[in-house]
A protein has these predicted regions:
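Active-site-adjacent structural segments surrounding the nucleophilic cysteine of cysteine proteases
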Residues: 1-79, 146-148
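Conserved active-site-adjacent core of cysteine acyl-enzyme catalytic domains
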Residues: 65-180
Length: 180
């Protein structure tokens, strides 16, 4: 099997999922820390979007970033953010409202269905699958299939974009929130 590292979406596709306008407030949230705290930004963004969807009153994005950083990025003595770190931060915030974070190793199995239901999803990109982002967390809000059947995601990237397009084959896991 030959790993294809470069992927580019060079055709017009039909994006499905949440309205792009829902992501506009997040354009101002750029992760400038070194090392980055992308898991915290993704979890906070997902929380704001789900709070709006579910009618739950939670904290502001700024308050969430402050509060979640310690529980996601620094709770355990290693560098980097694994899915269980993001999951822990989300569960800490959402358990009081009767919600739980779910996880699937293969994002392409769950993301289209969740987005059809209006549920945004945190996905992890990985260097092992050729992602130019290396290991990074994004919030996916739209998906599309190209003419060859390849699945693509449109996402909030906390490096400053709300319209990042990535191929699903460069992601390894998905996290989302559901009512218990």
């Amino acid at each position: 099997m030959k790993w294809e590292k470069k992927h580019s979406l060079e055709e017009k596709v039909e994006w499905r999922g949440l309205p792009e306008g829902d992501m506009q407030p997040f354009k101002a949230y750029v992760n400038e820390k070194t090392p980055g705290v992308c898991g915290t930004y993704a979890a906070a963004c997902l929380t704001v979007l789900m709070a709006k969807r579910e009618g739950v009153v939670t904290q502001s994005m700024d308050e969430l970033l402050k509060g979640m950083e310690a529980s996601i990025e620094y709770a355990l003595p290693y560098r980097g953010t694994f899915y269980w770190d993001v999951q822990r931060g989300l569960n800490n915030e959402w358990k009081k409202y009767g919600y739980k974070t779910h996880f699937n190793l293969f994002s392409e199995k769950v993301v289209p269905g969740l987005l059809e239901d209006g549920v945004p999803v945190v996905v992890g990109t990985t260097a092992a699958l050729g992602s130019p982002y290396k290991n990074h967390w994004l919030v996916v809000y739209q998906y599309a299939y190209d003419s060859t059947g390849k699945l693509w995601y449109k996402a909030y990237d906390n490096h400053g974009s709300i319209t990042t397009v990535i191929p699903a084959v460069q992601t390894l896991c998905a996290l989302w929130i559901e009512k218990l």
